[in-house]
Amino acid sequence: MLKIALLQVMPAETIEGNLKKGITACREAKAKDADIALFPEMWSNGYCIPSDADALRRFAVSADGDFVKRYQALALELDMAIAISVLESHEPKPLNSSILIDRHGKQVYKYSKIHTCDFDAERMLDSGADFYVADLDTREGPIRVGTMICYDREFPESARILMLKGAELLLVPNACPMEINRLSQLRTRAFENMVAIATCNYPSPKPDCNGHSTLFDGVAYLQEFPGSRDTCVFEANEEEGVFIAELDLVMLRKYRKEEVFGNAYRKPGKYGLLIDETINEPFIRKDRRV
């Protein structure tokens, strides 16, 4: 079993405070035998986006700066992968980024949120350039991992392109209320792509967050179970904590080889309209960015 620690923890009031609290949470994850520790969205500053551009820049950290390097050193020390999330320094605007660090302390990739919430505070941020998938070395062997962040979940293309790039597991830092419809989105993304999706949210009482971090394993059917099984194999409550979700990679890989979803029977030649950037009513929004 691959053990994923969902660090559903309240942020501190400072970047240094988040560094220390995050290190403590990672140590607890390791004590619980985790292979991967996943943080909520923009952990470095607790998902705080000031409306003043200069103040926002002061909150940002570099992808190769001390904040991230401390977690790289910690990953090496603990022999545990860490998916750390940051408000990343970038010009002309900061990025909402997640950096996957392997258990050897090396950065595997850096993903910056593509579907920024331009209708809200994230209009102060730049959006990312691409989706990335890479092999992550774990005690269970290599696993193909990709990342999407919070609002990315609401677009089927996010999980789909990660699946097409070979992802078996999607890591999702999150900062919003996880209610029935958003949880249903994650369930659907896992089901339709035959991928596992681990999501880590902030707990209550952080404003506009309510915990309910989850792991969906994407396996809807098993020979030994009649009908369809629940792909949600773990769901936390609203409280702060370090929660361990277990993923059966052997079962997932067998299922992906045999079932009919994912890329098995797609007809991409019929989907040309999906890359047409023309927007028509009722979907025209003045604050939309390309």
Map each language-model feature to its residues.
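Short polar catalytic/cofactor-binding loops
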Residues: 8-15
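C-terminal beta-strand edge segments of enzyme domains
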Residues: 133, 203-290
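Active-site catalytic loop in hydrolytic enzyme cores
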Residues: 89-165, 173-174, 178-188, 195, ...
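Cys-nucleophile CN-hydrolase/nitrilase-fold catalytic domain and related Cys-dependent amidase chemistry
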Residues: 15-16, 24-104, 108-110, 176-193
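CN hydrolase (nitrilase-like) catalytic-core segments centered on the catalytic cysteine
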Residues: 63-81, 153-243
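Short, acidic/polar
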Residues: 17-26, 155-160
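Extreme N-terminal starter segment of soluble prokaryotic enzymes
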Residues: 1-5
